[in-house]
């Protein structure tokens, strides 16, 4: 009897040792991650830059009766403009210098030419327009409002701006709602300088 039990136990152990082992469940390796494509940066718009200046000279002769010096004034309106590839204005800057000269009856200059000329923008509040302006704004504030209005517009759109004649000295004042309370200066000379600067843009 013992021999039979021993034989049965040996057979069971042998069968257990020969039974196929169930392989451990393998964890699949994580799939290689595909990097997300980098966000494409749009190519910058092509830009052209142009500058121009317009000179206007006026004056008065020497007054022989009063022996008053003659005068001459040179007003130079300057414009720098940047245009994108669609022809729209992305940057614009205006400034003006007013050079005044005096001369005597011999035609000799009596003005001190060693003094530099300060532009309207450089003068800032010292230009003194606010005290005589109906909107109480200085020249630099008004030209800044006009410059801002031009951004995003084409030169043709700038030229097409409606204007009105306020008086003999202000024949081209902006007649658009956005500038009614910010610009009362004559923009004719600035508009002409803009057209010239845009034509020079490269």
Please state what every model-predicted region is.
Residues 3, 19, 103-104:
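Alpha-helix boundary/interfacial micro-motifs
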Residues 26-47:
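Post-signal peptide N-terminal segment of mature Sec-exported envelope proteins
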Residues 5-6, 24, 125:
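Intrinsically disordered, low-complexity segments enriched in glycine/proline and serine/threonine
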Residues 16-30:
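Bacterial lipoprotein signal-peptidase II cleavage site
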Residues 1-16:
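Sec-dependent bacterial lipoprotein signal peptides
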């Amino acid at each position: 009897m013992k021999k039979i039990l021993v034989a049965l136990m040996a057979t069971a152990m042998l069968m257990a040792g020969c039974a196929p082992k169930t392989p451990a469940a393998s964890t699949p390796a994580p799939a290689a991650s595909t990097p997300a494509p980098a966000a494409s940066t749009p190519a910058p718009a092509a830009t052209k830059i142009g500058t121009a200046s317009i000179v206007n000279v006026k004056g008065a002769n020497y007054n022989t009766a009063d022996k008053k010096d003659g005068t001459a004034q040179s007003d130079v309106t300057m414009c720098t403009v940047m245009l994108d590839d669609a022809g729209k204005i992305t940057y614009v800057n205006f400034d003006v210098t007013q050079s005044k000269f005096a001369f005597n009856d011999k035609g000799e200059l009596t003005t001190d030419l060693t003094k530099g000329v300060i532009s309207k923008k450089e003068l800032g509040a010292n230009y003194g327009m606010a005290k005589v302006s109906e909107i109480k704004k200085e020249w630099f504030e008004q030209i800044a409002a006009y410059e801002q209005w031009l951004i995003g517009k084409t030169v043709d759109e700038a030229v097409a701006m409606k204007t009105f004649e306020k008086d003999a000295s202000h024949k081209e004042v902006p007649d658009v709602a956005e500038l009614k309370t910010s610009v009362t200066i004559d923009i004719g000379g600035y508009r002409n300088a803009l057209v010239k600067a845009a034509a020079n843009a490269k």
